[in-house]
């Protein structure tokens, strides 16, 4: 950051456990990917190769190499895991992640009918070899709207006890599922119940694919909240929100 002596919120430095920003790659061209990473690497902690895009990305290994050059971790979207599970090919998913040198994997049940206990069993199995990011919440807005705070808390705790390093709260890349309503509003009662529980908020990652959601979580939890599904073009814009350098969070 270019420092000209402004008093700003204190941000954690890389490698960081809190205040993480996780970008989502939806299949960007290689040169755009490289330029975006090089220009904002100080503010990017992870890149997720969204849903099953990694299977179609011809320059995947070069993208991964670019991330490693900038000390940025990567993982594949949880929907890819679910696709392998749906075809009873979990061992092939393991081989896929091993082949590409994954340190982290995402395990979810946002699309596939799978109980949280079943998901937790996969977390326990994979956590022996990988750092697991689990995901809680349905991608279906109608199903998600019926999930109570009690269920959210139960599933988060169950995933953590099974071995999840961190738990991601679903919001989709559209911000219209999981912890968000179909209209895109955060269900802040659930967030409040999580905050007031014994769950370590630093072990949670909130999907926030747009400025409204990013602003809401920063104002509710603070500048060092973990945020995911950030579009590539928002990496620096998000950091300005965290630092109160944008009108929306000016008075942090």
UniProtKB/Swiss-Prot annotation:
Signal peptide: none
Keyword Lyase listed: yes
Superkingdom, taxonomy of origin: Bacteria
SUPFAM superfamilies, A to Z: (2r)-phospho-3-sulfolactate synthase ComA
EC number: 4.4.1.19
InterPro entries, alphabetized: Aldolase_TIM (IPR013785), ComA_synth (IPR003830), ComA_synth_sf (IPR036112)
Annotated disulfide bonds: none
Keywords linked to the UniProt accession: Lyase
Function: Catalyzes the addition of sulfite to phosphoenolpyruvate (PEP) to yield (2R)-phospho-3-sulfolactate (PSL). Is probably involved in the biosynthesis of L-sulfolactate, which is a major constituent of sporulating cells and mature spores.
Protein family: Belongs to the phosphosulfolactate synthase family.
Stated name of the protein: Phosphosulfolactate synthase
Organism expressing this protein natively: Bacillus subtilis (strain 168)
Taxonomic classification: Bacteria, Bacillati, Bacillota, Bacilli, Bacillales
Gene expressing this chain: yitD
């Amino acid at each position: 950051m270019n420092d000209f002596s402004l008093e700003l919120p204190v941000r954690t430095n890389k490698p960081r456990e809190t205040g993480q920003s996780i970008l989502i790659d939806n299949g960007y061209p290689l040169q755009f990917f490289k330029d975006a990473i090089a220009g904002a690497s100080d503010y990017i902690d992870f890149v997720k190769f969204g849903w099953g895009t990694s299977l179609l990305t011809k320059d995947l290994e070069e993208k991964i190499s670019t991330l490693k050059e900038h000390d940025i971790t990567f993982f594949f979207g949880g929907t890819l895991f679910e696709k392998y599970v749906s075809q009873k090919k979990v061992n092939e998913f393991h081989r896929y992640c091993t082949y590409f040198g994954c340190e982290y994997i995402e395990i979810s049940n946002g699309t596939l009918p799978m109980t949280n206990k079943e998901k937790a069993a996969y977390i326990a199995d994979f956590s022996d070899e990988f750092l697991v990011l689990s995901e809680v919440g349905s991608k279906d807005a109608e199903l998600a709207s019926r999930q109570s705070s009690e269920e959210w808390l139960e599933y988060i705790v169950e995933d953590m006890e099974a071995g999840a390093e961190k738990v991601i709260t679903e919001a989709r890349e559209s911000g219209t599922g999981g912890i968000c309503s179909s209209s895109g509003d955060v269900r802040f009662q659930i967030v409040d119940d999580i905050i007031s529980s014994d769950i370590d908020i630093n072990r949670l990652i909130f999907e926030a694919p747009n400025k409204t959601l990013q602003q809401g979580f920063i104002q509710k939890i603070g500048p060092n909240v973990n945020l995911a599904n950030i579009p590539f073009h928002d990496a620096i814009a998000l950091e300005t929100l965290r630092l109160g350098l944008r009108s929306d969070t000016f008075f942090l």
